[in-house]
A protein has these predicted regions:
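Conserved structural core of kinase catalytic domains
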Residues: 1-31, 80, 85
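Conserved hydrophobic alpha-helix
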Residues: 35-42, 124
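Conserved end of the kinase activation segment
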Residues: 95-114
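Helical subdomain adjoining the active site within ATP-dependent kinase catalytic cores
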Residues: 133-206
């Protein structure tokens, strides 16, 4: 099993992962199902992970196996506050938007079951399509840190949003190693089927 990051982007998987280790769409779907079931058991116990990302899962796209690791950031929502708020790119926008507030500030959004669900949706999207749902062509600020905070937080906008193309990926700016997965026009998220489309719509649009 390998760190999930290797299978999260077109550039990484196309340049560094041997063809015989990439698995199939079906095996990666099984991988995602196992992660989702693991999170469901965690939530059923009244816990939240708070830092689910490709760095905190080990995956095997060949067999479709997966396991969640680095669960030292587990929280009990409302009782045991988190020590971490998550990994950039997987933190729910509402959590990132209030990260500067103190833990006891009533306006601060803390990691909980629903923010885990956002991270899970991002993880499934990246594993199946090899691109990030919020990493589009829009530059929100010339300062890299501010740009990230806006991209994943206050200005988070799905790259395949049906009515707002502000953050659409510019295919002519993609490198050869990022194709075809990096171009949503060639591989739209709808290829994942109606059930996952509904999940992605709820996570990134609704």
């Amino acid at each position: 099993e390998k760190n999930g990051k290797w299978f999260s982007s077109a550039k990484l998987i196309n340049r560094f992962v041997p063809t015989e280790q990439k698995g199939t769409f079906l095996s990666r779907l099984h991988m995602c199902l196992k992660i989702a079931r693991g999170m469901r058991r965690l939530h059923a116990a009244g816990l939240a992970h708070s830092d689910l990302s490709y760095n905190n899962v080990l995956v095997d796209p060949l067999s479709g196996s997966a396991c969640i690791i680095d669960d030292d950031g587990l929280v009990v929502p409302g009782k045991f506050p988190p020590e971490v708020v998550g990994t950039p790119g997987f933190i729910a926008p509402e959590v990132l938007a209030t990260k500067a507030l103190k833990v006891d500030d009533p306006k601060k959004n803390l990691p909980k079951r629903t923010t885990d669900q956002h991270a899970l949706a991002v993880l499934i999207y990246t594993f199946l399509l090899n691109r990030h749902p919020l990493d589009g062509g829009k530059v929100w600020d010339i300062d890299p840190q501010k740009d990230d905070d806006m991209r994943y937080g206050s200005n988070a906008l799905f790259i395949e949003h049906p009515t707002d193309n502000t953050n659409r990926i510019k295919a002519n700016q993609l490198g050869k190693s990022e194709l075809p997965q990096g171009d949503p026009d060639k591989l739209p998220y709808t290829i994942c089927g109606p059930y996952l489309k509904k999940l992605f719509d709820r996570a990134f649009i609704d």
